[in-house]
A protein has these predicted regions:
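Conserved ABC ATPase "signature" region
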Residues: 1-14
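Catalytic Walker B motif of ABC-type/P-loop ATPase nucleotide-binding domains
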Residues: 43-47
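H-loop/switch region of ABC-family ATPase nucleotide-binding domains
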Residues: 80-81
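ABC ATPase nucleotide-binding domains
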Residues: 119-138
């Protein structure tokens, strides 16, 4: 099972290395892989790609998206402050504003320019390319 999880999270080349020798991106993926080892019913990811460089961030987002799309995947709650970090394949979203739930539901009807603009009090354009979101203030 451990080898399969290492392969799923693209960590097979690091199986024999100590944690301290891994890059930040490799460490984040290792921590997530460790969390999925016991086949959880719920996986909570709190800003899993924060502080990663572009390559590590995109690789990790892609892996999380693929994992989330698998039929046997647990329910996943992912906290992020950046729409660009939402993996393709996520189906629902919740927007918080001032410590309260502002909007929640299917991602296509929740992550919209109107709702994001209202939640943040700033005119923001939201669009999606290949099921990945991005936001731009104007």
């Amino acid at each position: 099972r451990a080898r399969r999880v290492l392969n799923e999270w693209h960590l097979q080349d690091f199986a024999d290395r100590s944690f301290g020798t891994l890059s930040d991106g490799e460490r984040k993926r290792t921590q997530i892989a460790r969390a999925v080892m016991p086949d959880p019913e719920l996986l909570l990811l709190d800003e899993p790609v924060a502080s990663l460089d572009l390559a590590a961030r995109e690789q990790t987002i892609k892996i999380i998206g693929a994992y989330a799309s698998a039929p046997e995947a647990p329910a996943i709650i992912m906290v992020t402050h950046h729409l660009e970090e939402i993996p393709a394949g996520f189906t629902h979203a919740l927007i918080m504003s001032e410590g309260r739930v502002f909007a929640a539901g299917p991602i296509e009807s929740t992550i919209t320019s109107e709702k994001i603009s209202e939640a943040f009090g700033l005119p923001i354009t939201v669009d999606s390319v290949d099921n990945r979101y991005r936001a731009r203030a104007h």
